[in-house]
């Protein structure tokens, strides 16, 4: 199989199996932009809620607006000043760590470093959350305004749901718009694999690719992790089994494709996963899948393109990653 650079981007969905894996997404807003990630978003009391909040010289005004602009891998820096917290969503952004938020910055110094002298005051926050927010560089002013008792109850419930994402969950039927904790429509939850299951202890995940091993009909989910790649066997989707994970450079985005070809000497299908990493310098990781279902390993690293957003296979059966008859398969590296 040859490897070529490509400026085109193709989107392929593997439909060989259904594996529902909610990793760290708990957001009722627009879907994250595919490429606009790993940025700092800036907030200042004298800013303006316009644009993407990613320019230190033109910060946004509110945490809620900055949160809506934020994508996976982003973080929010808040300048010194006074901020009124009067809605549940803003408080959830502050407390959940889905998008890390930190106070104590100086707009005049381009939000470069936090300093305890830069007082970022929050009012309207229930007292029970003051200590956690203090650890993030905020000073909480307790008053009778802002989030009321009912809203405080809602935020507690949201945080509890977020915390429950960190543990494994069994199958759950979609009933009245929910499958367990998860909103649903015409789709049941078969299982939930928390990030804590992976040996590399990732803080987030970013991609998933399905792999059907034609040798033994087993099925796998190959996941791009914040700090590597993991493989979960989902042959029985209600009882997923952790195979293993491989550490790599931290990044908010990886892309994965699998290629299988028949080895006439062993009379078996050999399979490899190709993994690119965006905003990184690790090249294309080639993972040996031939030892599944027992283990995975890195067979080599191709450093022709040390950073790339997408990887794509052409001239293959997209459901299996097997080359089509009488044509040569190609590996495309895009967005390098």
Predicted regions located by residue number:
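N-terminal extracellular ligand-recognition/capping segment immediately after the signal peptide
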Residues: 72-100, 104-109
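Active-site-proximal beta-strand/loop segments in catalytic clefts of secreted hydrolases
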Residues: 44-46, 79-81, 104-105, 225-227, ...
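Right-handed parallel beta-helix/beta-solenoid
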Residues: 32-65, 82
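N-terminal, post-signal-peptide region of Sec/Tat-exported proteins
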Residues: 61-81, 210-229
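Feature marking well-ordered beta-strand scaffolds used for ligand recognition
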Residues: 112-336
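Bacterial N-terminal signal peptides that target proteins for export
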Residues: 2-18
């Amino acid at each position: 199989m040859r490897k070529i650079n490509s400026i085109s981007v193709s989107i392929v969905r593997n439909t060989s199996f259904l594996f529902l894996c909610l990793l760290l997404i708990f957001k009722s807003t627009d879907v994250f932009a595919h490429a606009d990630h790993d940025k700092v978003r800036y907030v200042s009391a004298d800013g303006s809620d316009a644009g993407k909040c990613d320019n230190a010289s033109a910060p946004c005004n509110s945490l809620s607006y900055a949160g809506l602009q934020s994508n996976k891998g982003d973080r929010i820096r808040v300048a010194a000043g006074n901020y009124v917290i009067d809605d549940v969503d803003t408080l959830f952004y502050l407390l959940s760590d889905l998008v890390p938020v930190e106070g104590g910055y100086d707009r005049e110094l381009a939000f470069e470093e936090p300093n305890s002298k830069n007082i970022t005051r929050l009012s309207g926050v229930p007292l029970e959350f003051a200590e956690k927010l203090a650890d993030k560089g905020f000073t909480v002013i307790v008053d009778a305004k802002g989030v009321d008792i009912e809203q405080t109850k809602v935020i507690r419930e949201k945080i509890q749901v977020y915390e429950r994402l960190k543990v494994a969950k069994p199958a759950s039927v979609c009933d009245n718009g929910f499958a367990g904790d998860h909103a649903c429509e015409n789709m049941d939850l078969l299982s939930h694999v928390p990030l804590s299951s992976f040996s590399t202890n990732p803080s987030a995940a970013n991609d998933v690719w399905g792999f059907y091993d034609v040798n033994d009909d087993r099925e796998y989910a190959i996941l791009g992790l914040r700090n590597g790649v993991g493989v979960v066997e989902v042959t029985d989707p209600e009882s997923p089994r952790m195979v293993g994970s491989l550490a790599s450079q931290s990044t908010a985005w990886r892309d994965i494709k699998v290629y299988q070809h028949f080895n006439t000497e062993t009379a078996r299908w050999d399979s490899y996963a190709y993994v690119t990493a965006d905003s990184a310098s690790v090249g294309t990781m080639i993972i040996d899948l031939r030892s599944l279902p027992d283990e995975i390993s890195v067979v080599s690293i191709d450093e022709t393109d040390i950073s790339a957003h997408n990887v794509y296979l052409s001239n293959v059966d997209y459901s299996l990653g097997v080359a089509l008859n009488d044509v040569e398969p190609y590996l495309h590296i895009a967005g390098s």
